[in-house]
Amino acid sequence: MADPVQSLAQLEILCKQLYETTDTSTRLQAEKALVEFTNSSECLSKCQLLLERGSSSYSQLLAATCLTKLVSRSTNPLPLEQRIDIRNYVLTYLATRPKLASFVTQALIQLYARITKLGWFDSQKDEYVFRSVIGDVTRFLQDSVEYCVIGVSILSQLTNEINQADATHPLTKHRKIASSFRDSALFEIFTLSCNLLKQASGKSLLLSDGSQHDLLMQLLKLTHNCLNFDFIGTSTDESSDDLCTVQIPTSWRSAFLDSSTLQLFFDLYHSIPPNFSPLVLSCLVQIASVRRSLFNNAERAKFLSHLVDGVKRILENPQSLSDPNNYHEFCRLLARLKSNYQLGELVKVENYPEVIRLIANFTVTSLQHWEFAPNSVHYLLSLWQRLAASVPYVKATEPHLLETYTPEVTKAYVTSRLESVHIILRDGLEDPLEDAGLVQQQLDQLSTIGRCEYDKTCALLVQLFDQSAQTYQELLQSGSAPSMELAVQEGRLTWLVYIIGAVIGGRVSFASTDEQDAMDGELVCRVLQLMNLTDSRLAQAGNEKLELSMLSLFEQFRKIYIGDQVQKSSKLYRRLSDVLGLNDETMVLSIFIGKIITNLKYWGRCEPITSKTLQLLNDLSIGYSSVRKLVKLSAVQFMLNNHTSEHFSFLGINSQSNLSDMRCRTTFYTALGRLLMVDLGEDEEQFSQFMMPLTAAFESLAQMFNSNNFNEQEAKRSLVGLVRDLRGIAFAFNAKSSFMMLFDWIYPAYMPILQRAIELWFHDPACTTPILKLMAELVHNRSQRLQFDVSSPNGILLFRETSKMITTYGNRILTLGELPKEQLYVLKLKGISICFSVLKAALSGNYVNFGVFRLYGDEALDNALQTFVKLLLSVPHSDLLDYPKLSQSYYSLLEVLTQDHMSFIASLEPHVIMYILSSISEGLTALDTMVCTGCCSCLDHIVTYLFKQLSRSGKKRGAPPPQESERFLHIMQQHPEMIQQMLSTVLNIIIFEDCRNQWSMSRPLLGLILLNEKYFSDLRSSIVSSQPPEKQQAMHLCFENLMEGIEGNLLTKNRDRFTQNLSAFRREVNDSMKNSSCGPNSNEMMS
C-alpha cells in the first residue's frame, strides 16, 4: 500500500478530505489513496481498527463501506469464519454504540444485511449460520426505543437487500435466497412489524419525542418492505404500477382474513402526524392489491367491504389529503379498487352508492385544481377509465350509478383544461400541453371515460367548441383583437380538438351505434371547418399547438374511419356529406392530403409539425385500399411529380440546416415510394421521371467532389439529405421490379460518391450513420427483392461495394484512438453496430454464392470478415451487452457466421476464438431474450461443428480434415473450461430460472453433453447431492429420464427426442424442488 495511508491518523485525514473539502484536486487525491487502501491486503484489519479507534464518523463510514465491498466480492471471497466474525462484531458494535451518526449506523446495517444475504445458504455443523435474523435483533427490540429503532432498521434493510437483485451475482442465486427468505423468515418479520405497530398505535405518541417518531417511521418502512417483496420473482416494473398484483403467499392468509390488520392501517392514518401518513397509505395500496385468489368469493367480498369503508372514512375526513404525498398515495389506493376488483363486486358493497358519490366529488375537485399534483390525476382517471370500460360487462342487478357520475368527471376534465388556458397565459405558467406524453396518457384515459354516456359528452363538446370557435372568428374579423384574447381562444380550441380526437379514437366497433357515429360526424365537421379558417390565415400567422392537435385528431380519425375494415355505410360520412359535401372516404382523403401539403408548405421549418404531418402521410400510404385511392388524387400526383425544395421547403438545404433534423425526409420518401409503386410496374420512364431531383442532386455532388476546393458543410448537407431520401425509397421498394430499377440507377454511377464520403468524413457520425444505414437497406433482401438473373453478376458486385464500404469505414474508425465514455457510442460503437447489421444482411441475403470469392482470388469476403474481427476486438465485452443495438447486431451477425462461415471462425487466432466464445457465454444470461436466443443458436452451430470434426477425426477413411478444423479442435481441447462453463450455465438456466426460450436452450445442450460426458456426469452428481436427502432420489431419476433413449449423435431425430425429454425434465425438476429449500451449497453449484 502507498506510504500516505500507513497510519490511522492519515486515514482519518483522507476521509475528512474526501467528504468535507471543496477543493476538487484534494478530494480526487484522497479518493485515489482510499481506493488503493480498499484494494490493499491490510484493508480488513485496518477497518476494524478504524471502527475501534477512529475519532471521526467519516472514518467509521469508510470502514463500514470498505467491509461491505470486501464481503460482496464474488472472486476471492472472505472465509466463512471471517464473515461470521464480522457479522457478530457489527451487531455488538451497534449494541454498544447507540449514539453513532445516522449515516454510520445505516452503513453498518447495510454491511450486516449484505453478509446475511450472501451467506444465506452457508452452513457450519449442519446449521445455517446467517439465518438467525430474529434472534440477532431480539436484544435490540427488548431494549429502549433507541435500540428498538436499530433492530427494526436491521430487519427493514435486510428485507430490502434480499429483495434486490445484484448485477455482480447470478440472478438464480438471488432468486433462491429470496425464495428461502420468503418461506422461512418474511412472514414472521411482517407479523412482528404489525404487532409493534399495534403497540405503538395503542400508546399516545408524543409529538415531541423524536425517538418514538423514528421508531414509527422505521416500522412503517419495514411493513412496506415486507408487502413490497417480490414474492414470486416477477420483478414488476414500477412504470406499470396500476397493473400490480401483490402475490402474497397462501401461508399469509390468516393475516389478511383478520380484519384488524386492515383496520390497523386505517386507524394509524387518522391518528398519526400527517408526515407519516404517505407510508401508511403505501402499505394500504399494497394490501389492497393482494392477489384475488388468496380469498374465496365470500372472503373477498368481506375484505373489499372493509377496504371500501376505510376509503369512505378518509374521503369524509379529507384534511390530510392537502399534503401532496398523501394525496398521491390515496389516488393510487383508489386506482387499486378497480384494478384488483370487478365492478360487479364493488356495486355489492353496502356503502357503494355513497362511496362512488364521494369518489366522484373528490375526482371533480381534483380535476378543477389542475395545477395541483398533475401526476396523481393519472390514477384517478385510471380508476374511472376502468369503471367505464366495465359497464358493458357488469352482470350485477345493483345500480352502478356511472351514468350519473362519469359525465361529471368528463365535464370536470374538459372545463378545467379550458379554464387553465387563460391563467397559464396570464401568469406565464408552464403549459401542460408542452408535456406531450402526460397529455396523451390523460387523453387515452379520457377516450374511454368520454364514450360512457357519449351523447352527454358530445353535447358538452359541441357547446364549448361552438362558443370558442365563434368568439375566435369574431376576434379575427375585428382585425384589431388583443393578441392575449386570440391566444386564449386558440388554446381553448387546441384542448377541444385534442379531446375530440381522443373520444373519436375511443370508439369500440362492437359497442358503437349509428347515433354515436353521427355524433362523431358532428364533431369532425366542426374541426374541419376550423381547419379551413386557420389554413386561410397561415400566410400571416399560425398556432403550432393548434396544428399539432389537428394532426392528432386526423390520426385518430384515420385509425377508426379509414381503412379496409371500416363499414362504408357509417353515419359519420352521411353527416360529413350533409354539412361539408364530403361523400366518401376518397373525398376525406383528399382533405387529408391537402392539409399535408399545406403543412409542408407553411410549416416546413417547424420540426414537430413536419414530422407529425409526414407520419400521417406514411400511415395513410400503408393501407392497401387507402393507398390506391390516394394515388388517384391530383394532389398526390402533384407530390410525385414535384418533390423539390421549391414546393416542400423542408427538402431545402441551407446553412441553418442541422444534419440530424433531416430524419423526416426518410419518412417522406418512404410514403412517396409506396405511392409510386402502386402503378409503377416496370415503367422505367416513370421511374426516371420520379428520380430526376435525386439524379440532379447526385450529379451536383459529383461535381463538388471532383473540384479541389468545395464547401464541405454544403456538401455534407446535400449528401445526408440525399442519402436519407434514398433510404426511404429503398425501404418502400419491396418488389423485385422496382428495386432492380433503383439498383441500376445507383450502381455503378453513384456508389463511388458514397464510398468517397465515407473516406472523407468517417469521423463524423452525422454523415456516416445515414450512409451506412442506406447500405444496410440496399443489401437487405426484403420480400426476395434482390433476385438477380442467372447471367447477372450484380449480387457479387453489390457485395464487393458492401465489403469496400465496411473495410474503408472500419479501418479508419479504428484510428480514432481513445474516446471519452460519453462519446464512445455516438462516435464509434453506433457505426460499428450498423456495419455488423450491413454485413449480416449481406451474408444472409441468399443472393451471393460466397464460395466463388476464394475460388477466383477475390478478397472482398475475406476483407469484410477480417474487418469484422478488428472492429470486434476493439470493443470491450462489457460494451457488447451494455448497448442494446450493438448487442442485437453483433449476435445476429455471429449467428450467420457460425451457421454458414464456421470454417472462417475456426481459422481465427486463439485469442479471437476465446473472445467470441466468452461473448456467447455472457450473452446466454442476457436479459434480452433475442440476444440469449441468438447465443443459443451460435453455440449450437459451434458445438455441432466440433462434434462433426471429432467424429471425422475418429474415422481413418476419407480426406484429411482441413487445417483450420484441426487448429480449432486443438484450441478447444486446450480450453475445455469454456465449453464446460457454457454447459453448466445452460443447465443452470433450464433448472433454476424462468427459462423463456426453452426450445432454443435445448438445441446446444445435447451437443454440449456429448462433448463433455465426464463433466456432465460430475455436474449431475453435484446437483443431486446438493438436494435435501429426501429429494435426491427424485432428482437422480429426473436426470435418468433426461438421457433415456438418447443416442451419441446430433441427428435431427435424436435432437428432437432430447428436446421432448428436456421439457419433461424441467417439469419434473420444478415439481421435485417445490416446497423444498435447497441444500447449503447448492447455490454455489454453478455460480
Swiss-Prot record:
Residues 30-96 form the Importin N-terminal domain. Expressed in oocytes (at protein level). It comes from the Eukaryota. Keywords: Cytoplasm, Nucleus, Protein transport, Transport. One of its GO terms (cellular component) is cytoplasm. GO terms for biological process: protein export from nucleus. It is found in: Cytoplasm; Nucleus. Its main location: cytoplasm. The keyword ATP-binding does not apply. One of its GO terms (molecular function) is nuclear export signal receptor activity. InterPro entries: ARM-like (IPR011989), ARM-type_fold (IPR016024), Importin-beta_N (IPR001494), XPO4/7-like (IPR044189). Mediates the nuclear export of proteins (cargos) with broad substrate specificity. Belongs to the exportin family. This is Exportin-7-A. It comes from Xenopus laevis (African clawed frog). The lineage of its organism: Eukaryota, Metazoa, Chordata, Craniata, Vertebrata. The gene is xpo7-a.
